[in-house]
C-alpha cells in the first residue's frame, strides 16, 4: 500500500530530473556539393565554356563551387492576446396556496449564478545579426542558386553552430559578393549552442519539477 502511494511522487521526481533536450536539427534540404562539369577545349583553344571568366564580368557568385557572404538581418516579433468572459444567471420562484386561501404562503425560491473570466497574452521577439560565407551547390535552370554553409565556433565555454541554406537570385548579390538574408528564398537559418553558457539558460531540477506535465496543479 505504501509503494502505491509513493508511485505518483516517484513519477513526478523522475519527470523533474529529465533534461530538456533541444530538438534535433532538421535534415539538410540541399544536396551535397556537385562537381562542376567542364567541357574540353576544342580547336586548340585555351579557355573553356564552363570554367573561363569574362573580362567584362564581375566577381559575383554564379557557378557551383563559388562562395558568397550572407549578411544576417533577421528580426521577428510576435504578440498574441486572448480574453474570454461569460456568465449565466437563472432564478425560479414558486408561491403555492392552500385550497385557494393565500393565508398559507410557502414561497420557494431558487437562484443560480455562474461567472467565468479568463485572459492570456504572449510576446516573443528574436534578432540575429552577423555574416556567414556559404557555397553555391547548384544552379537551377531558371538561374536560382542553391547555397548552403555553416560555421562552428569552439569556445572555452562551449560550442556554437550557425547554419544557413536556401535559394538566392544572382540579381540580389551586390558588387561586394554579399546578399542579405532577407533575400534568401526558403531560408533555413539555425543557431544553436552547447556548453556552460547554454546550460545556464536551462531551468534547474526543482523548476522542471513544477513545470512537469504530470504536475496536477
UniProtKB/Swiss-Prot annotation:
For this entry, list what GO says about its biological process. bacterial-type flagellum-dependent cell motility
Covalently lipidated residues (S-diacylglycerol cysteine) read 17
Which protein are we looking at? Flagellar L-ring protein 1
Q: Where in the cell is it found?
A: Cell outer membrane; Bacterial flagellum basal body
One CC-aspect GO term: cell outer membrane
InterPro entries named in the record: Flag_Lring (IPR000527)
> What is the membrane topology here?
Lipid-anchor
UniProt keyword Cytoplasm present = no
